[in-house]
Amino acid sequence: MKPISTLLLAIFVTLCTLLGAAARAAELHRDDVLGTSLDLRIDAPADQAMAAERAVLAEIARLDVVLSRWREDSELSRFNASVEPQDLSRDLRTVLGLCEEWRARTEGLFSCCMGALAQRWQQAQESGLLPTREELRVLASAAAAAEVSLDDSRPVARPQAVLFDVDALAKGYIIDRALAAARAAAPAATAISLDIGGDAHYWQSSGAGEAWQVGVADARAPRDNQPALATVALRSQAIASSGHATRGYTVGRRHYSHILDPWSGWPMQFAPSATVVAADATSADALATALSVMPIRSGLELADAMPKVAALILSDTGTAFSSQRWPALLAAEAGQTVVPEQLVMDYEVPRLVSDRYHAPYLALWIAHQDGSPVRQLLVLGERSRYLQDLPQWWRRYGRDDLPAIQGIARPTRMPGRYSVAWDGRDDRGQALPPGPYRVQVEAARQGGGHEFLSVPIDTGQGRGLPTQAQGSSEIGALQISRP
C-alpha cells in the first residue's frame, strides 16, 4: 500500500491538472477567413475549446455560402440571378430584414440594395474606364426606390434592376452567429473573443473578471504596427470599424472608396471613418458603415439615440468626434486623471442695434496655453463663406477639415444667453490631466464686426474658478464655472 502522503500528493497533482485544463485559454488564428484573418480565444476545458473551434469554423463556412456576393454558388448570388419569387433561408431572410431596418433608420443612407452599383464599379476597375455619372444615378435611383417585402415566410421576389449586397452587416452577423455556435459547443466556457478582420465580439470578461482591453485603430488607414488611437474596456460587447482607405476600387491610377453615396452612386469623398461599440457585432458593423456616409452631427445623434451604443468618428483629416457614451468605455491610462466635474461656460450673444441684423457665426473651443486646440465644443453657422471670418478658429480647425466642421455646425442663434459644458476630455474622448487651459470664443457677423476672447483657466483643484470675461461688441458676457 502506498503511503498516505504519496496518495494525497497524487490527488493534489490530479486536481491541479484538472483545474488547469478547465482554465485553459485556447487560441486559434486562421488566415483567409472571409477574405481576412480570424482570431479566436476561448476560456474553457480543452475538449470543449476544441469543439468550439470546430463549431466556429463550420458556422462561418456555412454562412459564407449563404451571404457572400463573391461566390457564384452562394444563396445570395442565386437570389440576385433571378427576379422570380424564391424561398429564402432563415439567415438570408433575417439579414435582408436587418438591412431594411437599417435603411429605414438612416433614411436610406444605409442600403443593401446597391449591389448593381458595386458590380458596375467592379467592372470599371477591370476595364480601367469610369462609369458615367448619369449611369450611376439611374442605378442609385433604382436602389433608392426598391421595395422589399419580407413580412412573412412566403417566397421573396427581387425588385427588378436591383442587386443585393449585404457586405455592410454580413460580417457582423456571421461573427454573432459563430460566437453563438462557440457558446453552444462549450457550455462551460467563461470567456470568448472572436475577431474577424478587426471587427470582434467579446463575450463575458477576460481572465479574472477583467474587461477586455481592445485597441482602437485609425480606421482611415489601419497599419499593423500603428499605435492605437485609444483603448476601450469591453464586457460582452462588440466593436466594428468602417473606413475608406484600405478597401475600394482602383480605376486607372486613382483609388476610390468602396463606400458609395446612395443618392449618386459615386464613391464617398472626404467622408469620415467610424468605430462603433454595441451589444452585438451586427449592429456595430451596420452603424459603422452608416456613420461613414452620414453627416457627422446626424451620425452622433443616431448613436446617442441607440441604447448601449458608443461611437468615435474621425473626419477625413483626423479630427475626432465622440458620442456621449464613448468616454465611459475608455480604459484608464496611467498618469491621467479625469477632471472631477464638468466646466460650464455660459456665453451671451449680445443684442445690437442694427437696421439689418444678422446673427453672428460663433465658435467656442478649449486650447492649451500655447493656443494649440484641445476640444471643439461649439460651432454656430453652417456656411463656409462666413466661417472663414473666424480666423483664430479657422486656422486651428476649419480650413483643414471643412466638410467635418459643416457636419457638426449648428444654426446661428439670436441674442440671448446660452450654455455649453466641457467634460475635461479632448476631441478623441481621452481624459486630460488637471492644469492650465484656455477657453477660446470667437464671433463674427455678416456686415458687422469680429471679436475674439481667450480666457485662462486652471482645472487643478478648481483654482481661479468661477471666472468671467466681457466682450465689447460681438460677444457678451462669458462666465466659466463648475456646475
Protein language model regions, located:
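Short coil-to-beta strand junction motifs in C2/discoidin
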Residues: 356-362, 436
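Mature catalytic core of soluble alpha/beta enzymes
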Residues: 4-8, 12, 23-340
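Short amphipathic, basic-aromatic surface patches that mediate peripheral association
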Residues: 345-357
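Beta-strand signatures of extracellular beta-sandwich domains
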Residues: 363-367
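Glycine-centered tight-turn motifs at strand-turn-strand junctions
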Residues: 385-428
